[in-house]
A protein has these predicted regions:
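Accessory alpha-helical/coil subdomains and C-terminal extensions
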Residues: 2, 8-12, 28-38, 152-231, ...
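ATP/nucleoside-binding phosphotransfer catalytic cores, i.e., glycine-rich phosphate-binding loops
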Residues: 241-320
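Short beta-strand segments
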Residues: 8-10, 81-83, 106-109, 143-147, ...
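ATP/NTP phosphate-donor binding region
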Residues: 1-70, 245, 265, 288
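Gly/Ser/Thr-rich loops at beta-strand to alpha-helix junctions
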Residues: 12-15, 84-89, 149-151, 235-238, ...
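Internal gly/pro-rich beta-alpha loop/helix module
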Residues: 107-178
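A glycine- and small-aliphatic-rich helix-loop capping segment at beta-alpha/alpha-beta transitions
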Residues: 21-29, 93-105, 121-127, 158-164, ...
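Short Gly/Thr/Asp-enriched flexible loops that form oxyanion-binding sites at enzyme active sites
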Residues: 84-103, 239-248
Length: 320
């Protein structure tokens, strides 16, 4: 029997076209729906699930994708999601933390619209179909396929505003490569905690630190309306002295605060014991999130809060 793959189109550049002025605009009809399937033994069904530029994607849309995949799990052997690249990594990470079926799930997109010179959409789409129909993809977690590379949802990030090789995995490198005749994997997926949520809500902003930062910016936050806070810290995980004093006060008020590094490579860890250093921050109750960027750490905290995690259980999850 042929493998059945469900494609969920959500919009983004891969579905768009450039108009006469060169501006890229939303298309009424997704050009990927007209791409012929060259893969033998693979039956492709496509659904226009959303038609949104990815800056318009919210956690509620990510949850809807998860629920659709669960709903269709018994009818399909794998799932491809076409998505705008600006928030693709966040949707991929969200799905990777959910109790998705043990079947391949691949996200892909494009950096150039369908009628631009050098358009990459069709190639990435067909590459995603190749990966999702490959038996080796089933135990790799949620994947991102772009530009002949396969990346783990947890680690991949968009690194360039326009380059077709924008999706990279800092520190680790790609999970695998798409070759002319075969698909090669370097690594296996890591075990992870998964959740089955039926709602996702809450306010968790991201605050980057900078030289000379004081408590004034944090004072402007509507703390009584916040569910958590992500701090994008210096280096291994440090903040200015005045900022740390305010963070300590917020933690005392019961606000969960998680920290990542603003560095592109490396992992945040408590190293320095001066005021504002990571050692002091962790002792005060700040969670040090390993190997995630700020936008994914935000989703991780939001998911944990919606799953009802608190206290040491929340700390263990955020720092695990």
């Amino acid at each position: 029997m042929p493998k059945k793959i469900l494609v969920l189109h959500t919009g983004g550049t891969i579905s768009m076209q450039a108009d006469d002025s060169g501006a890229v605009v939303t298309s009424q009809e997704n050009p990927m729906n007209h791409v012929s399937n060259p893969l033998g033994g693979v039956e492709v069904h496509a659904l226009d699930f959303f038609n949104l530029p990815s800056p318009h994607i919210k956690p509620k849309h990510m949850l809807a994708l998860y629920q659709k995949i669960k709903e269709e799990a018994d009818h399909y052997d794998g799932f491809v999601i076409t998505h705008g690249t600006d928030t693709l990594e966040e949707t991929a990470y969200f799905l990777d933390t959910m109790e998705v079926p043990h079947k391949p799930i691949v996200l892909t997109g494009a950096m150039r619209s369908s009628n631009e010179l050098g358009s990459d959409g069709v190639y990435n789409y067909l590459s995603a179909l190749r990966v999702v129909s490959d038996d080796k993809a089933a135990d790799k977690g949620v994947l991102v396929v772009m530009n002949d590379e396969i990346h783990a949802a947890k680690y991949v990030t968009k690194t360039h505003t326009t380059n077709v090789s924008t999706f990279q995995t800092p520190t680790h490198g790609p999970l695998g490569l798409i070759m002319k005749y075969e698909i090669l994997y370097f690594k296996t997926a890591e075990p992870r905690v998964r959740f089955d949520l039926d709602r996702i809500q809450g306010l968790v902003p991201i605050i980057p630190v900078y030289a000379g930062m004081t408590e004034e910016l944090l004072d402007l936050l509507p703390v009584d309306q916040l569910d958590g806070l992500i701090i994008q810290a210096f280096g291994a995980g440090n903040v200015p002295k005045e900022t740390s004093q305010k963070l300590n006060a917020l933690i005392q008020e019961g606000l969960p605060i998680a920290l990542v590094s603003r560095c592109f490579n490396g992992i945040a860890e408590p190293v320095y014991a001066y005021e504002g250093g990571g050692v002091c921050l962790q002792k005060a109750g700040v969670f040090f999130v390993k190997e995630l960027n700020a936008q994914k750490a935000r989703l991780k905290l939001l998911i944990a809060i919606n799953a009802g995690l608190t206290g040491e259980e929340l700390r263990a999850y955020m720092e695990g």
